[in-house]
Regions:
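A structural signal for beta-strand and strand-to-loop patches characteristic of beta-rich domains
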Residues: 1-256
Length: 256
């Protein structure tokens, strides 16, 4: 038999590592027991945000030399739930937007739980929470789409924190970093050598193409080329100084 361990987390899945192997002898009924110790990875000791899947493969050979194999998978972790959420790194706050707080058990099956979320101001360099009081709070039901309206929150760096309780009463948390901004911002909301946002890159006779470009640098010169497919629409030099410019390109038949 062999026992292999894979480590799962929000950001990666590790390759399986063999942690045990050996031989056992079946009893008179043809049954045998495999000793399996669910060892943690030394790299993630006591890390609540990772869990493991242990693959136990047994290969049995009878006296006639016939061989059969079977594999079982055991999931284990310090928590019985995994909580995730997707929040765009750059989130436009001008309009309400939808979000889903996803909760799954360690086998990847959805689990319905109630939870809480809180949005905190953060340091724009490392996204560490910069204040104890959240700027927005609320509740959610896992795996259900809900709408957030943050238009009155100042542009800047934030951390969204969410938490639920698993079936053992243990807290399970998830964090997501985001920069909130408005299309009306006159300067980048965080220090940015290049700030780019394209609310509409496809256009027709009624809807122009629109994008915003800016920089936090002072007295910066930028060469800008705008293409529609392979066709160059415009080429110009920009002199920007801690500002954002909005560009609008109405559709023309000559663009093709």
């Amino acid at each position: 038999y062999t026992v292999k361990r894979s480590t799962y987390s929000f950001w990666r899945i590790s390759e399986s590592t063999q942690i045990a192997s050996g031989e056992v002898i079946a009893d008179a009924n043809g049954e045998f027991t495999i000793p399996v110790r669910l060892e943690e990875s030394d790299a993630y000791k006591n890390n609540d945000k990772v869990y493991y899947r242990y693959s136990v493969e047994a290969t049995a050979t009878n006296v006639a030399g016939e061989t059969q194999s079977s594999t079982d998978v055991i999931s284990a972790g310090n928590r019985s739930l995994v909580l995730q959420m997707e929040l765009q790194e750059k989130t436009c706050k001008d309009k309400p937007f939808n979000i889903v707080f996803k909760a799954q058990n360690l086998n990847g099956r959805p689990v319905e739980v109630k939870g809480n979320y809180a949005l905190y101001s953060a340091n724009e360099k490392d996204f560490k929470v910069s204040g104890e009081t959240p700027v927005a709070t609320g509740t959610f039901t896992s795996n259900e789409e809900m709408t957030l309206d943050w238009k009155n929150i100042p542009s800047g760096a934030y951390v969204l924190k969410a938490s639920v309780k698993d079936n053992q009463g243990k807290e399970v948390t998830a964090d997501a970093n985001a920069v909130l901004f408005s299309r009306e911002d006159k300067r980048p909301p965080v220090q940015s050598t290049v700030w780019f946002y394209a609310p509409n890159t496809e256009f027709d006779a009624t809807h122009p193409a629109v994008f915003c470009f800016g920089t936090s640098e002072k007295d910066a010169y930028v060469m800008m080329n705008v293409f529609c497919g392979d066709k160059l629409l415009e080429s110009k030099a920009l002199n920007l100084s801690d500002t954002i410019m909005r560009f609008t390109y109405p559709y023309q038949e000559s663009y093709g």
